[in-house]
Amino acid sequence: MTEYESLVESLRIAYGDEFSKMATIIKGSENTPLYHISFDDKIKSFVPRFSTKLVNGESRAIPRTSTSSSILGCMLGFGDIGRGYLNNAFDSKRDNTLYIYKMGYALAVKPSKDLVPDVDYTDEHWLIAASVNTREYKGQITGKGFLSNISIDLLRNGCIYNYTWYFSLDEKTKFIKGLDLEPGCYCINLLDIGGYDFIPKVGDNIKVEKITKDEFLFHEGRRIESISNKRLY
């Protein structure tokens, strides 16, 4: 049985003969990179598993490693692009740096909204253990990013959150659909992102500025210092 046939069989077992209406198999290539983000920079391999962080209505029928075709998609799929930092939701003993893993894969699964209700929001793709060769997947760190600041603009009927992130990228990386960032360092402001109907738009709710390596290191140093003091600056 080929790798493709093994994957088809795994999907059929999980979702029945109508699986092709619920998921699409994607072939890996240099033009279809998939990314995974993590606070852990020492992951040697990714083993597909049943996630404990699923949106309401998301399929629990098959173990997988969740990825996205873009960094923002990973962040949205991660479930928080900033507010959790206000509530000390993450381990305060770490500097909460997000590491970007570019995944190695031959075949991936693009679920439909029937399986992942927010797939249009995150562009989630699954890496599935369908054979001996896909029991684990390798990823290479190609960049990192961290939240530097959260500003809040108070309005009459609510408030707007503005998240300032800094990224250092070792290779060309897709941040959102239609925006590939060249290797280098960037300051990215994400404005009031939230809700499945959110439409990211550069220049509107996403502002990207290329910065120097020295500028990145300066803000990274301040970030680590502020974490050690258990506060954001």
Range-by-range predicted roles:
Residues 30-42:
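Short hydrophobic beta-strand segments
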Residues 39-58:
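Short aromatic-glycine-(Arg/Gly/Cys) micro-motifs in beta-strand/loop hairpins
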